[in-house]
């Protein structure tokens, strides 16, 4: 039978304490979990821009556009619920304004007094009884022995975002490195990125109180979760990614992919806008980091990080209020007069190649050419908003296309494309959303578009159509709207024509379903789901008992007093790291030297109990004569100070191997990168070098077939290891060897120091045998699992990794010397 049949599933999975959807949890409901009632939002920017007057040293603050959902979520919690909110964000680039001269790149010099005045100025943003507390992050921050906080030009200050915007952002949107500038500057940009993330993490740790929830958001702060975890191990950390996440083929192009993925996995919960993005992230963790994964989790050192899609939304009540005020009605009346008897298509995009404005214009041009009956009856209002990072070539190509379309189809009284290059005031924006007969979103790659959701709300009972790129996360939310491929101009032209002539009943049906989706998946429901996800992780952590870490000092204090000592240690993953090629997992000189020292001490008995075959152990450890060796999970044993190997499986029936070999060969043939290892008493199918997802899938099928055809006829068991399946006799396991070793000691002369260490499920048999022996003093016996203290194991102690195990062995060996 499979050893998995012996372990109840509840040992490895926790049921959710709280439903993932539903009303917002009250902090009072979570009091028993130690929740403080405060949520620390971590965003790239504070919600306002700032500048300082060079002469008066007075600050000027103005609202920052963008990140609407995050700011709305935070303000809703602060003003309408019992949660307290704190926002940690960068001040952004701070320009100096001079009354004497205009210098767009003047040096900004700030000291501690300027910072104090800044805090006094932004306190006005905190008006109200329960508003959000703002905590600024200053970059580069004070230098040692100096009160200077900033002494840089605007362009120098903008460097903190260079890595995020020039390397990460293009790649997560499926765009490869665009220029040699990235190659030349990547290393320096990365150093700035790391420094910025450290500054954020330091500020968060400075204000953190036990029981706070921390929610870090977006790619500018990928490193922050692990940096916080390094300082506050029990912090409850969520990370939400508001953009696409690419497939592993693209993600592997990240020059710092391992550091980024491991850092994000410092969070307890990772959220994405779309299920496909979550799956891509999980797949990347498997393919790049070689981690164990599940449907909605990634296992990092025994800690299961939850990875799920939570659909982000908008603040619907706010949009309804904003779009229904008097000033919007006045603007709408003006638009109705200006575009009387005309169909209006609206486009609103950042000036960025990812938003597909040139493709949109070409599609509109193709539409007017293909369907001449629509000429003089439809206009495209394209609003293009400049971004912090300028794109002069893109803007030039857009202007040329607009000019070409207007020259080809325009007349004295008809201009087909109206191009607006500025951010609209709210009244103008909502009036356009209300007036437009269609919204045209043509993004090459985009997450959830707030524009589309706000349009649906503004079109209540007006039945305008959303033309939506299939490459946006919004397409999974608005199921019934026409989806377009930005690169297929003919199809886009046809969809535009069909949308403008769609019968009223069909438009009503689409509007009804879209409105239902938008009003169901709101900013409030998104916030509630985030908090529930963090509460579930916290509840699971409280249910689990963390395994205490064995320190070198504690091990040495017991070791130094013992007259008899026993070491029983696994090899792979315990004394050496797990690697893709098992043949590369060779012992270090430091390990061999320390094993030799410990084995030479007459007070010690040292055993390596491994799944490796005899030949491997002979090759690397045969020279250490005082070392006991057990190969193939206990099938073969060489006692300390002996050269003879004993075959404990000599009398066992091995006829099952022929059937297992046939099954393993079948799966090797269909799984590229897999291989068979035939030992004398066991057979192992390795798939570590195979595609991770295909290998895991084939392993499940292979295991099921072995259960049916082999385990039903022979006394064997299947062991699933790290990227391998092993079949072995049921009577042979590591626990049996531990039992034999302990029984070799007289009743009244057991070791007063026992160190038993292993990293995977096969080693749980060793711990089980140790625990069953009632003669052992539990205070001086250490059953140690290698990995996270959150790992599911029956071990009494944990050590983080093989390097730390070797360090402890070195300390004990030094005492022996």
Curated annotation (Swiss-Prot):
It comes from Schizosaccharomyces pombe (strain 972 / ATCC 24843) (Fission yeast). It catalyses: alpha,alpha-trehalose 6-phosphate + H2O = alpha,alpha-trehalose + phosphate. The gene is tpp1. Component of the trehalose synthase complex that contains at least tps1, ntp1, and tpp1. Interacts with tps1. Interacts with ntp1. GO terms for molecular function: trehalose-phosphatase activity. The lineage of its organism: Eukaryota, Fungi, Dikarya, Ascomycota, Taphrinomycotina. Disruption phenotype: Increases cellular trehalose-6-phosphate level during thermal stress. Residues 1-547 are annotated as: Glycosyltransferase. This is Trehalose-phosphatase. Its cofactor is Mg(2+). Keywords: Hydrolase.
């Amino acid at each position: 039978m499979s050893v998995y049949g012996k372990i109840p599933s509840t040992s490895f999975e926790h049921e959710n304490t709280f439903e993932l959807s539903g009303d917002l949890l009250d902090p009072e409901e979570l009091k028993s979990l130690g929740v403080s009632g405060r949520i620390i939002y971590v965003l790239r920017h504070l919600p306002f821009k700032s500048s300082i007057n060079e002469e008066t040293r007075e600050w000027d603050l103005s609202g920052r556009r963008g990140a609407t959902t995050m700011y709305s979520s935070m303000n809703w919690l602060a003003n309408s619920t019992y949660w307290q909110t704190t926002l940690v964000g960068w001040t952004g680039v701070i320009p100096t304004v001079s009354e004497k001269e205009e210098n767009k790149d003047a040096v900004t010099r700030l000291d501690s007094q300027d910072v104090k005045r800044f805090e006094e100025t932004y306190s006005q943003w905190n008006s109200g009884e329960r508003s959000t507390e703002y905590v600024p992050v200053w970059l580069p921050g004070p230098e040692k022995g100096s009160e200077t906080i900033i002494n840089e030009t605007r362009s120098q200050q903008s460097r903190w975002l260079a890595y995020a915007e020039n390397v990460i952002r293009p790649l997560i949107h499926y765009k490869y490195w665009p220029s040699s500038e990235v190659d030349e500057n990547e290393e320096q940009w990365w150093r700035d990125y790391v420094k910025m993330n450290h500054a954020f993490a330091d500020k968060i740790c400075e204000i953190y109180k036990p029981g706070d929830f921390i929610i870090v958001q977006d790619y500018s702060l990928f490193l922050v979760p692990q940096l916080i975890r390094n300082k506050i191990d029990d912090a409850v950390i969520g990370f939400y990614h508001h953009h696409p996440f690419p497939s592993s083929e693209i993600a592997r192009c990240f020059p710092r992919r391992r550091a980024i993925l491991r850092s994000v996995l410092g969070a307890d919960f990772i959220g994405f806008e779309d299920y496909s993005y979550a799956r891509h992230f999980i797949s990347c963790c498997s393919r790049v980091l070689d981690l164990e994964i599940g449907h909605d989790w990634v296992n990092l050192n025994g800690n299961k990080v939850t990875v799920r899609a939570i659909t982000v939304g908008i603040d619907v009540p706010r949009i309804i209020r904003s779009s229904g005020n008097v000033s919007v009605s006045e603007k709408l009346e003006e638009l109705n007069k200006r575009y009387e008897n005309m169909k209006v298509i609206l486009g609103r995009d950042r000036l960025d190649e990812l938003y597909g404005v040139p493709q949109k214009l070409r599609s509109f041009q193709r539409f007017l050419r293909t369907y001449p009956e629509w000429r003089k009856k439809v206009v495209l209002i394209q609003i293009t908003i400049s971004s912090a990072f300028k794109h002069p070539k893109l803007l030039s190509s857009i202007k040329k296309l607009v000019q070409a379309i207007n020259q080809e189809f325009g007349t004295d009284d008809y201009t087909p494309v109206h191009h607006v290059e500025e951010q609209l005031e709210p009244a103008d924006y909502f009036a356009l959303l209300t007036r437009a007969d269609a919204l045209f979103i043509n993004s090459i790659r985009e997450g959830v578009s707030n524009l589309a959701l706000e349009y649906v709300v503004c079109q209540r009972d007006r039945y305008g159509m959303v033309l939506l790129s299939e490459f946006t996360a919004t397409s999974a939310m608005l199921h019934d709207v026409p989806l377009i491929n930005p690169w297929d101009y003919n199809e886009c032209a046809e969809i535009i024509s069909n949308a403008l002539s769609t019968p009223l009943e069909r438009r009503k049906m689409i509007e009804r379903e879209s409105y239902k989706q938008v009003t169901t998946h709101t900013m409030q429901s998104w916030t509630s789901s985030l908090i529930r996800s963090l509460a579930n992780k916290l509840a699971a952590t409280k249910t689990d008992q963390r395994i205490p870490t064995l320190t070198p000092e504690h091990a040495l204090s017991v070791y130094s007093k013992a007259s008899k000592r026993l070491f029983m240690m696994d090899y792979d993953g315990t004394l050496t790291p797990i690697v893709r090629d098992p043949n590369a997992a060779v012992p270090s000189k430091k390990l061999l030297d320390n094993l030799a020292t410990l084995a030479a001490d007459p007070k010690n008995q040292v055993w390596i109990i491994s799944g490796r075959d005899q030949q491997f152990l002979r090759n690397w450890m045969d020279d250490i004569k005082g070392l006991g060796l057990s190969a193939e999970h206990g099938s073969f044993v060489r006692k300390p100070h002996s050269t003879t190997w004993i075959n404990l499986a000599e009398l066992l029936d091995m006829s099952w191997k022929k059937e297992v070999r046939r099954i393993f060969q079948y799966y090797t043939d269909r799984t590229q990168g897999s291989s068979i290892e035939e030992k004398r008493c066991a057979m192992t199918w390795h798939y570590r070098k195979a595609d991770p997802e295909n290998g895991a899938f084939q392993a499940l099928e292979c295991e099921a077939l072995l259960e049916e055809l082999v385990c039903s006829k022979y006394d064997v068991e299947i062991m699933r290891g790290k990227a391998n399946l092993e079949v072995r006799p049921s009577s042979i396991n590591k626990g049996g060897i531990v039992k034999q070793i302990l029984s070799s000691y007289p009743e009244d002369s057991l070791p007063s120091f026992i160190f038993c260490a292993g990293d995977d499920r096969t080693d749980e048999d060793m711990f089980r045998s140790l625990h069953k022996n009632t003669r052992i003093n539990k205070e001086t016996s250490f059953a140690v699992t290698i990995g996270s203290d959150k790992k599911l194991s029956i071990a009494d102690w944990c050590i983080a990794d093989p390097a730390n195990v070797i360090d402890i062995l070195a300390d004990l060996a030094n005492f022996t010397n």
